[in-house]
């Protein structure tokens, strides 16, 4: 028989930096899950990633206090800001432009995000990434 699911916990944790302090500790402690076990498993799985890159994770909590977790790809906005070498997007995205990325950079971001996007092919994914960049005040050359 399948385990009874008592809830899902969605968090964004920097790669390799999960620790029992907030937001991880309180979120897992509320459900009675082993916080250190999660932190060790998460840090081990994010070892190959760039340290500090925020990684969305969905933790499934079961009635017997066990858990599983699924890691997603880093948010597109973070990858776009990194590619454009800017700290934050524009406060007036359609009038003030803060940076630009090339189509090749947009394709690289789209390849990274492909598992989490609903796009049918790479070209559609690139257009999705370009739309996100435009809404941040970053121009995409060649799209």
Swiss-Prot record:
Role played: Forms part of the ribosomal stalk which helps the ribosome interact with GTP-bound translation factors.
GO cellular component, one term: cytosolic large ribosomal subunit
Domain of life: Bacteria
Quaternary structure (record): Part of the ribosomal stalk of the 50S ribosomal subunit. Interacts with L10 and the large rRNA to form the base of the stalk. L10 forms an elongated spine to which L12 dimers bind in a sequential fashion forming a multimeric L10(L12)X complex.
Family: Belongs to the universal ribosomal protein uL11 family.
SUPFAM superfamilies with a match to the protein in the record: Ribosomal L11/L12e N-terminal domain, Ribosomal protein L11, C-terminal domain
PTM info: One or more lysine residues are methylated.
Organism: Burkholderia vietnamiensis (strain G4 / LMG 22486)
GO molecular function list: large ribosomal subunit rRNA binding; structural constituent of ribosome
Gene name for this UniProt entry: rplK
One record GO biological process: translation
Keywords tagged on the record: Methylation, Ribonucleoprotein, Ribosomal protein, RNA-binding, rRNA-binding
UniProt keyword rRNA-binding present: yes
Protein name per UniProt: Large ribosomal subunit protein uL11
Family annotation (InterPro entries): Ribosomal_uL11, Ribosomal_uL11_bac-typ, Ribosomal_uL11_C, Ribosomal_uL11_C_sf, Ribosomal_uL11_CS, Ribosomal_uL11_N, Ribosomal_uL11_N_sf
